[in-house]
């Protein structure tokens, strides 16, 4: 029997009620399947779009990399430039330069170069074909020379140096005061000493004094060992000396400390070898720099040597090293002060008698006294003690004394009258 809800002539006319329910359920299933399929396709579409964006980013990245590599390739294919030096500046953008090969040329200048930088002596890059100035090369320091500048703060002060009060005062007057309070000298009408030579036996504190000066002044401190100025090739040592003083002028106020001065300033002899002649060239360059036509107002020189007897007389004359400071072996009072300084951070027992230690260390240098303090601490560590006792110091004195006696018996330290058979 037909349902009264079905109108005649409708799409459902002729369909039984059961059949209509079954058809509705199948349509709903089909709709759910289509919706699920649609969600899956939307996810796929979103994933594809994400991959597309990633590939586009990768494309941009690789294109940028290609441009970078192409630029580097073009740069590597660029013809090299010739290094030259400006000799003179002429009007109408014309410059006289000397190429690295030696001859001089009158060349043009690029309009993009600042003319203020084109001073005589400036390094420039020249076009290989036209020799026109392409760019001005900034002046650079020799790495070997730049490494001589002491950048780190040196933790050594005058209160850590015992028994050298007079030497400290002379060093302050000759080095510190001219840099810190130059008006004192101007008021009196004198020029301060230009150089100070510290001389004395090894281990007496010459280098320590120089370190204290570096700590107390805000000046640029340039440390040079004399043997570093002795170079293999002709002219290299003289060039280093020039560049050291040039750096000192640029970074003034500055202090140049030359350790082991006797290695380059030994007395000149008539009979010399090729190596000796190169050392003499370096010495002559040092003498020329110390004299100079320009006054070294803010540059002070300190030198140290164990052998003042072998120095060339030319370097000791007034105007070069004006003040000679003898750093002697410490006396009994000075030895006591030095021992107290080196034992300042040590955990000591109450029986330490510094006066007695100063007496039994007769003839020892400051370096020997520091070795005694270290050895005493080592004896205490060996015995697993909590404190360093007097007996540890006495054992250390004996050990250091034996080492010093052994060193004196070595062939290089024997008197000149000693002969070996």
Swiss-Prot record:
GO terms for cellular component: cytoplasm; proteasome regulatory particle, base subcomplex; proteasome-activating nucleotidase complex. This is Proteasome-activating nucleotidase. It comes from Methanosarcina acetivorans (strain ATCC 35395 / DSM 2834 / JCM 12185 / C2A). GO terms for biological process: proteasome-mediated ubiquitin-dependent protein catabolic process; protein unfolding. Residues 22-79 form a coiled coil. GO terms for molecular function: ATP binding; ATP hydrolysis activity; proteasome-activating activity. ATP binds at residues 203-208, 342. Pfam families: AAA, AAA_lid_3, Prot_ATP_ID_OB_C. ATPase which is responsible for recognizing, binding, unfolding and translocation of substrate proteins into the archaeal 20S proteasome core particle. Is essential for opening the gate of the 20S proteasome via an interaction with its C-terminus, thereby allowing substrate entry and access to the site of proteolysis. Thus, the C-termini of the proteasomal ATPase function like a 'key in a lock' to induce gate opening and therefore regulate proteolysis. Keywords: ATP-binding, Chaperone, Coiled coil, Cytoplasm, Nucleotide-binding, Proteasome. Residues 1-25 are annotated as: Disordered. It is found in: Cytoplasm. Its main location: cytoplasm. It comes from the Archaea. Gene3D superfamilies: 1.10.8.60, Nucleic acid-binding proteins, P-loop containing nucleotide triphosphate hydrolases. Belongs to the AAA ATPase family. Residues 419-421 are annotated as: Docks into pockets in the proteasome alpha-ring to cause gate opening. Consists of three main regions, an N-terminal coiled-coil domain that may assist in substrate recognition, an interdomain involved in PAN hexamerization, and a C-terminal ATPase domain of the AAA type. Homohexamer. The hexameric complex has a two-ring architecture resembling a top hat that caps the 20S proteasome core at one or both ends. Upon ATP-binding, the C-terminus of PAN interacts with the alpha-rings of the proteasome core by binding to the intersubunit pockets.
